[in-house]
Curated annotation (Swiss-Prot):
Protein name, as recorded: Protein nucleotidyltransferase YdiU
Gene (UniProt): ydiU
Protein residues bound to Mg(2+): 259, 268
InterPro entries hit by this protein: SelO (IPR003846)
Record key words, sorted: ATP-binding, Magnesium, Manganese, Metal-binding, Nucleotide-binding, Nucleotidyltransferase, Transferase
Species assigned in the record: Rhizobium etli (strain ATCC 51251 / DSM 11541 / JCM 21823 / NBRC 15573 / CFN 42)
């Protein structure tokens, strides 16, 4: 029981249990946040705070000071993490946290360890020429997308809080400053391994690998070859994650190796977006000039990133280099099969199939080709198909998803024939489909509207409304029906920006 006196201690909301700070100091740079002028708490994620075992009462009182960096909580060991990375294929040997500061780690009520990190908390030794700050728009975007991904069931970092700083930040224009508090299973990236490998720091790579196994994959400690098993486990999680991205039409936008976690969580939502009209070549990010990270390219980029991780682990996988390369290549080749298995399993679920038949892949591909040819909305097409799967399957919306409504007839006939051989009941199938086909996603135009109102008018009502809708993405919410609709032509977001 926390006494009233203890609650009144500044920053007593956290019970930090820091492990990364115990690694050799070349892994990070100690760095306190830089205080800001007038912090104001926009949003505190109280359910998440409770899951993390934090004192919500203290956070309500001191949250503006803590989450802005003005008050460093007791037990925190603030630091900026070192890492490298391939950015759009080009290697940068030193990147690191240029505007993010890890306050420390807490152990949640589920017994799992989590990082608490402030983004936009000031300059660090890795800032290069940056100011270490964040603008309000990108902070709100990351809050919205993080929590939407959680509600959709996609592994991702979480949003604990957002604050304004009362200070301007200078980009192409002057914008209000803000700080985002991110929660992650960890912030260890492929680029973290690359940082040490690029320096020939074999002991650094080994220490990091041991730490990752201990923190994220403790079951591998007894494996015959723990480091080869680690590479395989990371590959499995990444294949599953990217398959889930494709199932919901998510486009990360900047899949650099410094933006790929070894924990299997989605991280860094700067230019990310959700596809409206289905087109596998869709790109939103303003800096992805050649479509490297387009929707359909994401699985292959995941494999490319894993190859970069494998390169760093070769000396640990086997002392004989040729043998190490063979073992790593086997994992990289298997990634494609892993991804395809996860993707097809999820797509079967999206069209209501419980059993497996050889023709299922072609049936899925035929639907996607029809959607592309007919300019169909990705999210609503699958949701409306769910409405056709039940006993009361008279819902006409599916056909209207297509420019030529009659164009869907042939595919629907094939689909119904396939359903007739599937073991599920109609009611069970419809319920299962609705549990994997969302009705609400963070539509890009809705996200931009919420950001614009907050930045230009200090009006956070659209931000709050969007969070409320997206908290239940698989449920029909008649009072928020407008949020399910695709953008009108004049509302379409054609480009997204990193915002850093």
């Amino acid at each position: 029981m926390t006494s009233a006196l203890e609650k009144n201690r500044p920053g007593a909301a956290f019970a930090f249990d820091n492990s990364y700070a115990g690694l050799p100091q070349r892994f990070f740079a100690p760095q306190a946040p830089t205080p800001v002028a007038e912090p104001w708490l926009i949003k505190l994620n109280e359910p998440l705070a409770e899951e993390l075992g934090l004192d919500v009462e203290v956070l309500r009182r001191d949250g503006a000071a803590i989450f802005s960096g003005n008050l460093v909580p007791e037990g925190a060991l603030p630091l900026a993490m070192a890492y490298a990375g391939h950015q759009f294929g080009g290697f940068s040997p030193v990147l690191g946290d240029g505007r993010a500061i890890l306050l420390g780690e807490v152990v949640g009520r589920n017994g799992k360890r989590y990082d608490i990190q402030l983004k936009g908390a000031g300059q660090t030794p890795f800032s290069r020429r940056g100011d270490g700050r964040a603008a309000l728009g990108p902070v709100l975007r990351e809050y919205i997308i993080s929590e939407a991904m959680f509600a959709l069931g996609i592994p991702a970092t979480r949003a604990l809080a957002a604050v304004t700083t009362g200070e301007p930040v200078y980009r192409e224009e002057v914008l209000p400053g803000a700080v985002f508090t991110r929660v992650a299973a960890s912030h260890i990236r492929v680029g973290t391994f690359q940082f040490f490998a690029a320096r020939g720091d074999a002991e650094g790579v080994r220490a990091l690998a041991d730490y990752v196994i201990d923190r994220h994959y403790p079951e591998l400690k007894e494996a015959e070859n723990p480091y080869a098993a680690l590479f395989e486990a990371v590959s499995e999680r990444q294949a599953a994650l990217i398959a889930r991205w494709l199932h919901i039409g998510f486009i990360h936008g900047v899949m650099n190796t410094d933006n790929m976690t070894v924990s299997g969580e989605t991280i860094d939502f700067g230019p990310c977006a959700f596809m409206d009209i289905y087109n596998p070549s869709t790109v939103f990010s303003s800096i992805d000039h050649h479509g490297r990270y387009a929707y359909a390219n994401q699985p292959a980029i995941g494999q490319w990133n894993l190859a970069r991780l494998g390169e760093t682990l070769l000396p640990l996988i086997d002392a004989d280099q040729d043998s190490a390369v063979d073992k790593a290549n086997a994992v990289i080749r298997a990634y494609g099969e892993r991804f395809q298995a996860h993707w097809l399993k999820g797509m079967r679920a999206k069209i209501g199939l419980e059993g497996e038949e050889d023709g299922d892949l072609e049936l899925v591909q035929a639907l996607l080709a029809l959607m592309q040819a007919q300019g169909a909305d990705f999210t609503l097409t699958f949701r409306r198909l769910s409405d056709l799967a039940g006993d009361d399957a008279a819902e006409p919306g599916f056909a209207t998803s297509f420019r030529e409504p009659d164009s869907s007839g042939e595919w629907l006939a094939r689909w119904r024939g396939r359903l007739s051989r599937d073991p599920q009941t109609a009611a069970g199938r419809a319920a299962a489909m609705r549990s994997v086909n969302p009705v609400f996603i963070p539509r890009n135009h809705r996200v931009e509207q919420a950001i614009e109102a907050a930045v230009e008018s200090a009006d956070f009502s659209l931000f709050e409304a969007l969070l409320k809708v997206l908290a239940k993405p698989y449920e029909d919410q008649p009072s928020f029906a407008a949020y399910m609709e695709p953008p009108k032509p004049n509302e379409r977001v054609l480009q997204t920006f990193c915002g850093t």
